[in-house]
Amino acid sequence: MTTVDSNTTAPEPVVDPNAVSVTINGKVVAARKGEMIIAAADRTDDFIPRFCYHPRMEPVGMCRQCLVEVVGPRGPMMVVSCMTPVADGQVVNTATEGVKKAQEGMLELLLANHPLDCPVCDKGGECPLQDQAFSHGPGESRFVEEKRHYEK
């Protein structure tokens, strides 16, 4: 039989000094200081489109496909989620109309000079760019200039 001393208090919960609280699409997420927004969003199952981001590499932010909206003191602002670290109390939206429009615009620019010969391409259905165009693309391009052609 064990006895409990009523004078003992429960230990204080350990608080991680490197943790910050971020709200992503209305969900509160615990993230590490310095962690990029895109990595924190991945843990909430809020997929942010990307081409140049890989969790095991340094972020470069070249494709701009991972744009999200961060609500700040001066209102919402578009930021590149693979290059922007989380901050305590930050509010991030990944699926607003403005974000979707910006992501479509970036994808449209990536496709602007891309050859549109997907049926005969060597990648034939295994192309991340093609997958992104189908899932996050605008459907049609505003650019009608002639594309670059390469010898096969």
Model regions and ranges:
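Fe-S ferredoxin-like electron-transfer domains
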Residues: 2-4, 8-9, 64-152
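N-terminal cofactor/phosphate-binding cores enriched in small/glycine residues
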Residues: 20-88, 97-102
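Terminal leader/tail segments of proteins
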Residues: 1-21
